[in-house]
């Protein structure tokens, strides 16, 4: 962009999940460029366009709900007017198929990135208001190629930094600690970690936290702005409030607040999730009010406790006052 676009106060506040009062404060502090036109104030976006955030859903434990969360959070953000790109890095391609995409050529996947250094052209999913870089079994070949090339796990991060036109990029990482998982994890501003409210879920956190620290240390060599905790949000999943065991595990997960925010739990709802998978639609569209409200609540917590905090920490809130 030559000169930043002028955006109304309410629109910028909505984009970042902050109040207009917070926007006014940023203008008064001189951190924003406010422009008055008649009775109304606008903010001029910085050169380079809209604020883009990249987050990776990550855990090496299968069955924690990582892929469905990526699908549903992405759809909810798109419904609110954000421009969203989903990236499927898992050769099992569950995110791809759960959004109704069946036939995928190798050059449409991240195999194209590893071969050429360029992102493939995303698929436009007009029905959901999303863009998707899909996956297929061909993506399994990437693991070996990444092992043979030094620093290749930063390819996706580098390519996404050059990509314009999105407010959010959400990456669905495969349940692994290998090179392909690292490609997805290192691409983001941080990790969104689903934690099943079970003994297995808590035990898996040890490996997740060790990997997160290693990723952070690696990124610190190329980007000094990496946050102290590379985990940006813990999301308790498959929670059954009726069981003593789940409630005890939830208490343990709540104790992680010193490391990163802990979202409200996502309940165990096998029926709605099965219908969403069978119909290849986001969870919000299967007619279960409680499931829809949980995703809406998670989205609010994500915007308030992760996105707004990250933007404030970096001092790049690009919003407006009225």
Swiss-Prot record:
KW ATP-binding (keyword) present: yes
Superkingdom: Bacteria
Pfam families membership: AAA_31
InterPro entries the UniProt entry points to: AAA_dom, DNA_Partitioning_ATPase, P-loop_NTPase
GO biological process terms on file: chromosome segregation
Keyword flag ATP-binding: yes
GO-annotated molecular function: ATP binding
Keywords: ATP-binding, Chromosome partition, Nucleotide-binding, Plasmid
Residues holding ATP: 60-67
Annotated PANTHER family: P-LOOP CONTAINING NUCLEOSIDE TRIPHOSPHATE HYDROLASE (PTHR13696), PARA FAMILY PROTEIN CT_582 (PTHR13696:SF52)
Family classification: Belongs to the ParA family.
Function: Probably involved in plasmid DNA partitioning.
Protein name: Probable plasmid-partitioning protein ParA
């Amino acid at each position: 962009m030559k000169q930043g676009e002028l955006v109304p106060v309410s629109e910028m506040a909505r984009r970042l999940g902050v109040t207009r009062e917070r926007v006014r404060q940023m203008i008064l502090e001189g951190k924003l460029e406010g422009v008055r036109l008649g009775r109304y104030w606008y903010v001029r976006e910085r050169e380079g366009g809209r604020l883009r955030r990249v987050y990776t859903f990550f855990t090496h434990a299968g069955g924690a709900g990582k892929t469905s969360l990526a699908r549903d959070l992405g759809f909810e953000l798109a419904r609110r007017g954000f421009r969203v790109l989903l990236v499927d890095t898992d050769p099992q391609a569950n995110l791809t198929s759960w959004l109704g995409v069946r036939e995928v050529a190798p050059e449409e996947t991240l195999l194209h990135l590893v071969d050429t250094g360029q992102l493939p052209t995303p698929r436009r999913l007009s029905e959901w208001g999303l863009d998707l870089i899909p996956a297929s079994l061909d993506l399994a070949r990437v693991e070996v190629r990444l092992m043979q090339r030094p620093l290749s796990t930063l390819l996706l991060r580098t390519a996404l930094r050059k990509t314009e036109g999105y407010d959010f990029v959400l990456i669905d990482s495969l349940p692994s600690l290998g090179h392909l998982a690292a490609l997805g994890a290192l691409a983001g501003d941080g990790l969104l970690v689903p934690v099943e409210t079970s003994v297995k879920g808590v035990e898996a956190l040890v490996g997740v936290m060790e990997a997160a620290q290693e990723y952070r240390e690696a990124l610190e060599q190329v980007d000094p702005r990496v946050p102290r905790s590379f985990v940006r949000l813990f999301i308790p999943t498959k929670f059954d409030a009726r069981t003593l065991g789940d409630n005890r595990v939830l208490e343990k997960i709540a104790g992680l607040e010193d490391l990163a925010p802990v979202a409200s739990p996502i309940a165990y709802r096998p029926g709605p999730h099965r219908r969403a998978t069978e119909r290849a639609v986001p969870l919000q569209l299967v007619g279960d009010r409680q499931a829809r409200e949980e995703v809406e609540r998670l989205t609010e917590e994500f915007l308030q406790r992760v996105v707004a905090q990250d933007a404030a920490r970096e001092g790049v809130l690009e919003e407006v006052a009225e």
